Design a protein with these regions (language model features):
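C-terminal interaction modules of eukaryotic adaptor/scaffold proteins
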Residues: 282-333
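Acidic, Ser/Thr-rich intrinsically disordered and amphipathic helical segments
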Residues: 207, 227, 273, 277, ...
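Beta-strand cores of modular interaction/reader domains in eukaryotic scaffold and signaling proteins
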Residues: 13-15, 22, 67, 263, ...
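Low-complexity, intrinsically disordered regions in eukaryotic regulatory proteins
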Residues: 255-287
Length: 333
């Protein structure tokens, strides 16, 4: 089935079960006639026994039609809605006393301009979970608290990061936090699998290192790069190795400053519109290398579109010290 989605201030989109399409009115030089019960040529050929003249009644006509073009689902609003009331844990007074908006799957389907499959996939990507029938995002400090419980248990039990037992985690940590939250954090930061009838998790090293980097950077405007790398490596669980490529789309290194610095720049905080996204990036930095800018524009690529094609359209290429760099095609205010 097809459904048109969009609020009064939004450009309507058409959604199937798994795809989203922009809708635009297109003109046609041929008049389109609306005929109830009209048969196609194929249907008429199939009924050759009766060759009668058909007197058709025209119910209406049009000189334009809706043209559909596959587009990216508009999912930024999903995170924005869920971040109105992030889940801070079962003991949070805010959760018990205040009545913030909470959203079911049906609510999100009516508010987000995307297909059902695209919305459900994005909920997985942003690590949302269902609590009492409502979709929630964990407040970051609470998320890190849960992750810390798990990594400390892994360390104290000397478990392999590739084989963390669910049952033991729930038994050991169930007195500290709800078991649903412990399992959710394992699902968010690990891959679930079964071995000899027992459920285990293989922890994602890159994702854990990335979360700890975000925690370290969130309260600093800029961080000395070498100092940050030292503190970051000391902060991750034993056996994990930190690398700057784990921070793509999360943090940006300023190699032009002395000493070199790093600061938080999350791709999800940037505008969803292509031109606005490029304007924001060129306000932050006048010239970008392709390596630096790619994590911040990759999600803008439409079906079969490349990062190179986006850069050709929205940026101007030049060479600086033998390195190809990109700056804005238009003046940035």
């Amino acid at each position: 089935s097809l459904v048109i989605r969009g609020e009064k201030d939004e450009q309507a989109v058409l959604c199937s079960k798994d795809k989203t399409y922009d809708m635009k009115i297109a003109d046609t030089s041929n008049m389109l006639l609306f005929i109830p019960g009209c048969k196609t040529p194929e249907q008429l050929n199939a009924d050759q026994a009766s060759c009668n003249i058909i007197h058709a009644q025209i119910a209406g006509f049009s000189n334009n039609y809706w043209e559909l073009r596959r587009c990216r689902p508009k999912l930024k609003k999903l995170r924005k809605l869920l971040m109105e009331d992030p889940y801070e844990g079962p003991e949070s007074r805010k959760d018990q006393t205040l009545t913030f908006s909470k959203y079911t799957t049906e609510d999100l389907l009516s508010l987000i301009q995307a297909s059902e499959e695209e919305i459900l996939h994005e909920l997985q990507v942003i690590d949302a979970c269902k609590i009492e029938g409502y979709w929630r995002i964990l407040e970051f400090d609470y998320e890190m608290k849960l992750l810390n419980h798990v990594t400390q248990l892994i360390d104290s039990e000397s478990w392999s990061l590739s084989k963390v037992p669910l049952r033991t985690c729930l038994e050991e940590l169930g007195s500290l936090e709800p078991t649903e939250m412990i399992e959710h954090i394992l699902l968010s930061y690990g891959r679930k699998y079964t071995d000899d009838g027992e459920i285990y998790f293989e922890m994602h090293e890159d994702k854990i290192c990335r979360a700890i980097a975000r925690m370290l950077l969130q309260n600093a405007v800029k961080f000395n790069l070498s100092e940050f790398q030292e503190v970051w490596q000391q902060s991750v669980p034993e056996g994990m190795t930190t690398r700057l490529d784990q921070l793509k789309g999360l943090a940006l290194v300023d190699k032009s400053s002395r000493p070199e610095t790093i600061f938080l720049l999350k791709v999800e905080d940037l505008p969803e519109d292509n031109q606005e996204r490029f304007n924001s990036l060129f306000r932050i930095r006048e010239k970008w290398t392709e390596v630096d800018i790619t994590p911040y524009i990759q999600d803008l690529c439409a079906e079969k579109q490349t990062v190179g094609a986006l850069l050709t359209k929205y940026a101007r290429c030049s060479t600086q010290n033998g390195v190809k760099v990109y700056n804005s095609r238009r003046p940035i205010s």
